[in-house]
């Protein structure tokens, strides 16, 4: 596998489909990073990413970032990554 430098297991929590889908991963991962900046809580990002973005934290972050109109797209991306 050709995994970019700087990537580790913590970057892909349960996301078996991340290889070959880096653009999707970057897209959903950015939601969690932005969410942590909004809430200023060091645990938000890891909770958002947990179980490959399939927890309620991920959905809460989408809503907190005022991206409700794209929630189905982000959930689809997360499900692709989890495969």
Swiss-Prot record:
InterPro entries from the UniProt entry: Crust_neurhormone_CS, Crust_neurohorm, Crust_neurohorm_sf, Hyperglycemic
A GO cellular component entry from the record: extracellular region
UniProt cross-references to Pfam families, sorted A to Z: Crust_neurohorm
Transit peptide in keyword set: no
Keyword annotations from UniProtKB, A to Z: Disulfide bond, Hormone, Neuropeptide, Secreted
GO molecular function: neuropeptide hormone activity
Domain of life: Eukaryota
Tissue: Found in the sinus glands of both male and female. Found also in the brain; the neuroendocrine structures of the protocerebrum.
PANTHER family in alphabetical order: ION TRANSPORT PEPTIDE, ISOFORM C
Protein name: Vitellogenesis-inhibiting hormone
């Amino acid at each position: 596998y050709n995994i970019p430098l700087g990537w580790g297991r913590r970057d892909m929590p349960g996301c078996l489909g991340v290889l070959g889908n880096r653009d999707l991963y970057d897209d959903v991962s950015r939601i969690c990073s932005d969410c942590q900046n909004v809430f200023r809580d060091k645990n938000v990002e890891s909770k958002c990413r947990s179980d490959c973005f399939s927890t309620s934290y991920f959905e809460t972050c989408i809503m907190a970032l005022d991206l409700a109109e794209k929630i189905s797209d982000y959930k689809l991306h997360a499900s692709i990554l989890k495969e």
